[in-house]
Every structure is written in C-alpha cells, then in structure tokens.
C-alpha cells in the first residue's frame, strides 16, 4: 500500500491529497468487504470536512469512483439480486437457493433488507414493500411511526440534544451514553442516509441564522427540508411586497378622493417623521384620548398615563421647551381661552387612584393658563417691612374664588407628584404611596432668608373648594412698584388632610427662579414670638393657616415682618404659663390642636418664627406611649435618638437631620436609611475580603464562605451546603423532581434560574453585552469570562507551579498533572 503523506507541513493550505490514501489494484483486491467499506467511509468523511472549511476544488476521481460503486456494494452483504436489478452480477449458484420462493425464511431475508439496509436500498423500498401489502396496514404501525407525529418527535429530540446538560451526579459515562442516545433519536442514522443527515444540520443552522420575525413563523410551519424553508420565505416576501403596494395604492386613492371633494388634507406626521432640523414639540410625543376612550380606562391606567405624560412634559421643559397653546407661545398678556376641566365627583383629593379624568391637552392648557395668568389673579400680597396690611375687598375675594374654581382638577394633572407629600386622613390607614406635587422637575421647594412667607388658608362660611391654584405674590408698595427681592410663588394645595369634617387649604411657597436647587440645610434664624388678636369669628379653624387667613379677611392683625415661616396656634385666653418659644398642651400629635372657640373674644395667637426648612406633612414623631401626660416642646430643636425627628417652636414645622453629620432630609424614608448607615446596621464590611453588604442576612451567608461552615447537609449523599435553598435544589437531584417546565419544548428543570437561561435559547435574547467589542451573551458568567480576554485577568492560580488560568475548569485539568484532586481555588 502506497500512502502519500507529506514529510513536512508547509504553510500552504491543506489539500485533499494530503489526507487521502490510494491503493493499487493488487492491494485493493486483497481487502475484504468490511475494509473496503471502512475505507470508503473515511474518504467520504475527509472530503466532507474539506468542503465544510470552504476548500473549493474539483471532486477527486477517487471520490467519484466510490460514489459510483456505492449502489453495487450491497450485493456483497447478501442482498438478493432481484432487489437491485440495475446492477449486473453473476447468477447465484442454484444449490445455494435451497428454499422455495414462498418459504417464510425468504420473507425474513427481505424484512432484514427493509430494516437494516434502508440507507443503501432506500430507492427500492417502495418496490419491495409492494410485494407485502399486508405489512403496510396503517393499523399495524406504531404510534411513534405515524407521519403526523414524526416532525414533532424529531424537533423534540433535537431540542433535547442541543440543550443537554451534564449532571455531576450521573457520571461522565452515563452522561455520554445519554447524549449519544439523544443524537441517535434526532438524526436516526439507521433510517437516514448521510445526505439526509447533512440536510438536517444545514436546515438547523439556516433557521438559527434567520431574523427573529422570520424564524418564529417558519418554525411554526414545521418544514421538512431546506427547499421547504426557501419556498416559505419566498412566499412571505412576495406577500409582503403585494401588501405594501396595495397599501400605497389605497392611500393614493383616498388622497385623490379627498382632493376631489375639496377637503384640504394634511399629511399625518408622527414623532419619528419630524425632521431633524425642527424642534420636537409636545404634540409629537403626546398621546390623547377622547371622553369615551377615557371612560374605558381603569384607575391604574389613568395613573400610568398621568405619570408618563407629566414626565414627558418635564423632560421637554428641562431641555428648554416652552409650553404653547394652539402652536402659539403664551405670554402673561396673551388672552387665554377658558377650558373647563372634566371633574370626577368621586375624586376630590390628590389620591393615587383618584386622578382627574381629563385629556392631557386640556390639562396642559389649564396648567399653562394658571402659570401665565398669575399676575392678573393676585390676592393676598405680602407687604414689605413697615407697610400696613392691605385688606381684602369683595372683588378680590370673588376673583380668588373664581380662579380657584377654574383651576380645580387641572393643576393636579399638571404638577408632577414630587417633593411635597400630602398625607390623607379619614380611613385610618396609611396610603401605600404618598401623593406629591411640584411645578416641574426644575421647581423645588425652597425658602429664601429674606423672602416674606406666610401660611394662607380659607375658613369661612363658604365651603372650601378642593382644587389647586397658583398665585404669584409680588414684593412692592401699594402702587405696584417692583420690589427688590425675588417673587415667591404661593402653591395652594387643598385636601382632606387633617380632619374628616373640616377642610383646609395650605400654601407652600416656592421660588420660581430656583430650578434644580440642591437641598441644602438653611441657616437657622430664631426670633421672638409676636402676639396678634383675632376678632369675633363663627369659624372652627383647625390649623394656624386658617387663623392667619381669617385675620387677613377680617382685617385684624398684621403679617409678620421678616418671618420666613409664620404659624398661628389657637390658644385659650384663660390659659397661662406660655413662654417665649414654648408651647404647652396635652396632645399626642401636631394634628390634635384644639379648634378656635366660637364666639371667643380677645384670644391671643402665638406666632413662632424660624427659618428651618419646613416639611408640612410628616409622620408623627412622638407615639402615644405617654398619653395623658403633658409634654413641653422647647423652641430649640429636639431629637429622639431613634426616630430622628426634630421639633421646632411648634408641632407643625419639623426638620429631619442626622445627628452626627448634620445632613437634613425632607423625606422620612431617606432619613431613616441614612441613619441606619451611620449606626452601622445597614452596611456590613467583611474583614476577610473587604466586601460590603447592605443586608445583614447576605453578610451572614457570606461569612460562612470564609469559615467553611456548611450547616445544611444532605442525608442521602452527605453533601453540605451554606444555604437551605441550595440544599432544597440539591434534593431534587435525588428525588428526580423537575418542577420547572419549558412551554416551548417541554423540557423540565430543577432550578428556576436554569429555565430562565433556557428560555433565552428560544427567544434569542442576549441581555449581557461587552462594552468593548459589543458582543452579546445569554449568561452573565459568559460575559465575565469573555471580558477576561480584554483585561488579561487570570484569577485561578495553581498552588504548585503558580500558573494562572481564566477558567476554573482549566485549573482543575491542570491540577491533574500534579496529582492534585478536584479542588477549586478561590478567586484572588
């Protein structure tokens, strides 16, 4: 036998002659049948491998000869000559055929041809099976052999083979046999030829390369071969082209009809069609509903629509977009049409589930109208120091009520729910999510040291309007001259907050020029109290803001001169013992303040001034553990060391401040979280590796890694685990329980994370992307392993020779060379 093997391997590409073997005629005659078959299989496999690596060359002569001789070789396997009449063979010896033609043994020999040699005698099977029609009865076929289930079984076998996972408990030998069995179930080499198997592999790769929208549809049709896939794709492409042309023709026809009717049609433009050189307007990104569609929406959908549209408005305002109405920019002097908002009688406050049902276009118009009509609706102007208080006239009060009614329900939609909390009372339960309002993202609550601010409310014989309004208070004289300081904005937020029967309105003052101002603790200015008298009143006022507003309406009293925050508390005239800055009373919370007594005269109101940041709606600091006892709240700030809530001169104004870093908070949740960090109970640092944990439970689990503690042990195999969940997952291996099943292919898993990773093979999702090269991965561990190729990191080091590896499996294989047993090394 002469073999042409190269002695040296050049740098040129490998040729077929380099991997082929040739025989002379004498050597070929000495080979038996099995050796010839083995030679043919090896040569054909080498030829297929050369083609698969894109080596383009003409078919060698030896391959052509082997393919021609394929049909004649089965005769040497004792197949009768009449099964392959096209091959010319010498007639067999008559003595060898000692059985009659109708003998059962002859039928057995034919059955062997059908079952064992289908890959060779496939084209002749139809002719042979026609000789035995009784064996082809559909009732004799097994259910697995039915044609309707053949494609489904093939696809299921392919999925099982592709997604096979090695289980350590099964062992390598058993796992290999299972994988080989799955491969046989899918490819079926006993019943398919090599060409058919190759067709299956090409079909699978082609389907994986298709786009997602094509692949899902093609797989649903269950194509048998590549030709069927190509036909399906061509039909789908032609149908899509026909639909596109039909849509274009119908659109052109509609436009022609409209032109004939004389109707001026405008092209419909979407946000994606806005030219790049034109600025994006709110109408390009807004979604509108009519009244009928709005009624069909549920409370949750309305709330989501409310939040999305307000966030969009805030984003546009933050990048410099100015609100407009009717494509016309609004100015304070421009006339604005009155748009009556749609009210829901069941929702009167700023509850989460009670969003006013208005289309956003009217919401925007009402909000912008209030923003630009502030100067025309001035009421309750704050006076400069030294000027007497201006009395309200009947016209100003009626104008105030009109503006409140017009803005009712509109500002609730315009103002995003941020920065100001509104705590509601009446159900006795705490709301799941507090309602907050703000002008936009760039409008923060802030008090300036030199701006005069006071709390305003409404308490009178007329009912309180549960709406919202914005009023601009100007500094200056009575003649309307502008003042020197900036103009604060009074934001009135009425709601049923403090009592069920008595409603009240409160005002929060915000500086419109302070956009996106960080929350900085203001300086503290202490000032002595001032006393004012309140005239006769038949009103029951719950809050100091109601008392102050009552003073302004009746003309009694005067506003504070330089107070940044004015709060009036009703005090009985016969009570004594009040000191400067102190408030004594038997109460459990700031809400339980005795109302203003009817018909009382000469009662004094204590006015306490401070410049601390005011948070009007907060949780009660002191619980009812000392109910019935008198408490004295000093003017200086007090702090409970555990709840961290500070008091000022009254129960209303509270400031939250961390005691060891002097950082102020306006939100209770932020303050509690911050204090936990200071106390050390929220952040835990591992002394071994330096890792930080915000959860003590995770930290306790992490410590067991260093100590080697494994308290949860399997009673079946003795394996121990750090967490109980790991033991539960391990026990499913012994019990065989696989509770998680894939709805696509029917495969089951014993772990939730395993099925979530498996589902990505169906959806094609690759959520983990490399920031350097953009390559995507289905699992985070694959991304971590890939990133080491960029960084050069090798965290797994051999303790014997110091060689480093990127994967733990490589280290385990390397340790075998040193005679070390399987033992993973920790990451450095």
Swiss-Prot record:
GO terms for biological process: extrinsic apoptotic signaling pathway; neuron apoptotic process; regulation of DNA-templated transcription; regulation of JNK cascade; retinal cell apoptotic process. InterPro entries: KRAB, KRAB_dom_sf, SCAN_dom, SCAN_sf, Znf_C2H2_sf, Znf_C2H2_type. This is Neurotrophin receptor-interacting factor 1. Residues 345-355, 458-478 have a biased composition (Polar residues). It comes from the Eukaryota. Residues 384-394, 600-611 have a biased composition (Basic and acidic residues). Ubiquitously expressed at low level. Expressed at higher level in testis. Ubiquitinated by TRAF6 at Lys-15 through 'Lys-63'-linked polyubiquitination. 'Lys-63'-linked polyubiquitination occurs in response to NGFR/p75(NTR) cleavage by gamma-secretase and promotes binding with the ICD cleavage product of NGFR/p75(NTR), followed by translocation into the nucleus and subsequent apoptosis. Keywords: Apoptosis, Cytoplasm, DNA-binding, Isopeptide bond, Metal-binding, Nucleus, Repeat, Repressor, Transcription, Transcription regulation, Ubl conjugation, Zinc, Zinc-finger. Its main location: cytoplasm. Residues 418-433, 589-599 have a biased composition (Basic residues). Coiled coil: none annotated. One of its GO terms (cellular component) is nucleus. The lineage of its organism: Eukaryota, Metazoa, Chordata, Craniata, Vertebrata. One of its GO terms (molecular function) is neurotrophin p75 receptor binding. Residues 158-240 form the SCAN box domain. Residues 328-355, 377-490, 575-611 are annotated as: Disordered. Belongs to the krueppel C2H2-type zinc-finger protein family. There is a cross-link at residue 15 (Glycyl lysine isopeptide (Lys-Gly) (interchain with G-Cter in ubiquitin)). A zinc finger (C2H2-type) spans 684-706, 712-734, 740-762, 768-790, 796-818. Interacts with NGFR/p75(NTR). Interacts (via KRAB 1 domain) with TRAF6. Interacts (when ubiquitinated at Lys-15) with SQSTM1/p62. It comes from Mus musculus (Mouse). The gene is Nrif1. It is found in: Cytoplasm; Nucleus. Transcription regulator involved in NGFR/p75(NTR)-mediated apoptosis. Essential component of the NGFR/p75(NTR) apoptotic pathway: upon ligand-binding and subsequent cleavage of NGFR/p75(NTR), binds to the intracellular domain (ICD) cleavage product of NGFR/p75(NTR), translocates to the nucleus and induces apoptosis, possibly by regulating expression of key regulators of apoptosis. Induces NGFR/p75(NTR)-mediated apoptosis in retina and sympathetic neurons. May also regulate expression of neuronal cholesterol biosynthesis genes. Residues 14-85, 280-370 form the KRAB domain. SUPFAM superfamilies: beta-beta-alpha zinc fingers, KRAB domain (Kruppel-associated box), Retrovirus capsid dimerization domain-like.
């Amino acid at each position: 036998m002469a073999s042409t093997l190269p002695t040296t391997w050049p740098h040129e590409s490998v040729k077929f002659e380099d991997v082929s073997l040739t025989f002379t005629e004498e050597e070929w005659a000495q080979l038996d049948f099995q050796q010839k078959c083995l030679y043919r299989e090896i040569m054909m496999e080498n030829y297929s491998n050369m083609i698969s690596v894109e080596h383009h060359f003409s078919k060698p002569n030896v391959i052509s000869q082997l393919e021609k001789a394929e049909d004649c070789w089965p005769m040497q396997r004792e197949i009768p000559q009449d099964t392959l009449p096209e091959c010319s063979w010498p007639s067999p010896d008559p003595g060898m055929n000692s059985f009659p033609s109708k003998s059962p043994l002859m039928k057995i020999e034919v059955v062997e041809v059908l079952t064992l040699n289908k890959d060779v005698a496939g084209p002749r099977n139809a002719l042979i099976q026609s000789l035995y029609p009784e064996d082809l009865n559909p009732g004799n076929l097994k259910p697995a052999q039915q044609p309707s289930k053949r494609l489904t079984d093939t696809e299921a076998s392919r999925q099982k083979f592709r997604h096979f996972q090695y289980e350590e408990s099964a062992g390598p030998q058993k796992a290999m046999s299972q994988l080989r069995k799955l491969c046989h179930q899918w490819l079926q080499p006993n019943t398919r030829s090599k060409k058919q198997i190759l067709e299956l592999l090409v079909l699978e790769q082609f389907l994986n390369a298709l786009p997602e929208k094509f692949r899902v549809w093609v797989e649903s049709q269950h194509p048998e071969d590549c030709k069927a896939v190509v036909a399906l794709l061509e039909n789908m492409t032609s149908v899509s082209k026909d639909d596109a042309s039909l849509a274009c023709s119908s659109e052109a026809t509609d436009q022609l009809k409209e032109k004939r009717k004389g109707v001026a049609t405008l092209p419909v433009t979407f946000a994606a069609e806005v030219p790049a050189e034109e600025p994006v307007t709110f109408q390009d990104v807004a979604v509108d509903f009519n009244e009928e569609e709005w009624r069909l929406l549920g409370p949750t959908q309305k709330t989501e629509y409310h939040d999305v549209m307000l966030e969009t408005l805030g984003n546009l305002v933050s990048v410099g977009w100015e609100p407009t109405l009717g494509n016309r920019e609004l100015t304070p002097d421009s006339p604005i049409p009155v748009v009556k908002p749609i009210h829901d009688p069941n929702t009167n406050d700023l509850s989460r589930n009670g969003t006013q049902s208005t289309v956003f276009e009217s919401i925007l118009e009402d909000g912008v109208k209030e923003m630009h009509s502030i100067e025309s609706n001035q009421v309750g102007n704050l006076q400069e120091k030294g000027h007497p208080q201006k009395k309200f006239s009947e016209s100003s009060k009626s104008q105030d009520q009109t503006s409140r009614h017009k803005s009712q329900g509109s500002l609730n939609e315009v103002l995003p729910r941020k920065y100001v909390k509104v705590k509601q009372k009446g159900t006795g339960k705490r709301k799941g999510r507090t309602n907050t309002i703000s002008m936009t993202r760039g409008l923060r609550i802030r008090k300036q040291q030199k701006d005069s601010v006071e709390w305003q409310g409404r308490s009178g014989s007329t009912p309180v309007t549960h709406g919202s309004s914005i009023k601009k208070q100007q500094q200056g004289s009575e003649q309307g001259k502008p003042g020197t300081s900036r103009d604060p904005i009074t934001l009135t937020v009425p709601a049923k907050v403090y009592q069920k029967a008595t409603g009240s309105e409160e005002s929060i003052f915000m500086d419109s020029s302070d956009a996106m101002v960080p929350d900085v603790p203001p300086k503290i200015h202490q000032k002595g109290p001032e006393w004012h008298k309140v005239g006769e009143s038949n009103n029951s006022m719950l809050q100091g803001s109601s008392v102050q507003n009552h003073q302004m309406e009746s003309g009694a009293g005067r506003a504070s001169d330089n107070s940044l925050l004015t709060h009036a508390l009703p005090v009985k005239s016969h009570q004594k013992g009040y000191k400067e800055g102190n408030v004594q009373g038997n109460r459990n919370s700031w809400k339980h303040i005795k109302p203003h007594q009817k018909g009382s005269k000469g009662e004094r109101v204590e006015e306490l001034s401070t410049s601390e940041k005011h948070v009007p709606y907060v949780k009660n600091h002191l619980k009812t553990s000392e109910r019935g006892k008198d408490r004295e709240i000093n003017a200086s700030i007090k702090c409970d060391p555990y709840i961290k809530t500070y008091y000022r001169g009254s129960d209303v104004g509270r400031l939250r401040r961390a005691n060891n870093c002097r950082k102020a908070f306006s939100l209770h949740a932020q303050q509690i979280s911050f204090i936990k960090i200071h106390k050390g109970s929220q952040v835990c640092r591992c002394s071994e590796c330096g890792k930080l944990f915000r959860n003590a439970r995770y930290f306790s689990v992490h410590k067991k890694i260093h100590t080697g503690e494994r308290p949860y042990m399997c009673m079946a195999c003795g394996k121990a685990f750090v967490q109980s969940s790991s033991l539960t997952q391990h026990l499913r291996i012994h019990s065989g329980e696989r509770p998680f099943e894939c709805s696509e292919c029917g495969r089951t898993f014993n772990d939730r994370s395993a099925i979530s990773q498996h589902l990505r093979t169906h959806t094609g999702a690759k959520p983990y992307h490399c920031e350097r090269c953009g390559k995507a991965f289905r699992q985070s561990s694959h991304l971590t392993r890939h990133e080491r190729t960029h960084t050069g990191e090798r965290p797994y080091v051999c303790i014997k020779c110091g060689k480093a590896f990127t994967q733990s499996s490589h280290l385990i294989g390397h340790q075998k060379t040193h005679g070390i047993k399987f033992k993973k090394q920790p990451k450095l």
